Regions:
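Solvent-exposed interhelical
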Residues: 109-120, 124-125, 167
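Membrane-anchoring alpha-helices and their flanking helix-loop junctions
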Residues: 1-106, 113, 131-188
Length: 188
């Protein structure tokens, strides 16, 4: 029978393969963030992801468990991870050709407000954060839980860069959207 950690690994591998294939459908960017901006959020997200996903020996005491191992706890994390990845995929499908792995605007870029974008302005980040919380619960290590705020910081840096760019491009329309829809967590 498959164990929770194996299920988590499968979820992330399937998501990554699909995400890479979907990237081939993105339109060409006409405005793109600076290399420095990409570097800052990229390093934070990568460092946090290594802590959440990794089991490297150099992490030493950070690999200690946080709570007693129970199968139901691991499977709860798997469910959260699957839900988060599904939400991120739904958002990626909804944004379609306007998606970019970097902070960018596409030719004829439209402000997407439907589907998951009616729930949160950055549903891909929301979904990925939920998936990482689920992964940390399943991994059950201090390193995994310490990695979560590091990933959040990286995504927050990118979110702020995107917000500035979208505000410049869409002006009052984006201001209205910002007033109506939360950035990451619904109802907050």
């Amino acid at each position: 029978m498959i164990r929770p950690l194996e299920a988590i690994g499968c979820l992330w591998l399937v998501w990554l393969a699909g995400w890479m294939l979907a990237a081939l459908t993105a339109a060409k960017s006409v405005v793109r963030q600076s290399g420095t901006g990409r570097l800052v959020h990229g390093l934070l997200v990568a460092a946090g992801a290594i802590l959440v996903l990794g089991r490297h020996s150099w992490l030493g005491p950070l690999l200690r468990q946080v709570y007693p191992a129970k199968a139901w706890i691991g499977w709860t994390g798997v469910v959260l991870c699957a839900a988060g990845l599904a939400f991120a995929v739904w958002a990626r499908v909804q944004i379609g050709r306007f998606w970019s792995g970097t902070v960018a605007l596409k030719a004829e870029h439209a402000l997407i407000r439907g589907g998951p974008y009616a729930i949160t302005r950055h549903p891909i980040y929301s979904g990925l954060l939920l998936a990482l919380v689920g992964t940390a619960i399943t991994r059950d290590s201090r390193a995994a839980f310490l990695g979560l705020p590091v990933v959040f910081a990286g995504l927050y840096v990118k979110l702020k860069q995107e917000e500035r760019l979208l505000l410049e491009r869409f002006g009052p329309e984006y201001e209205k959207y910002r007033a109506e829809v939360p950035a990451l967590i619904p109802r907050l």
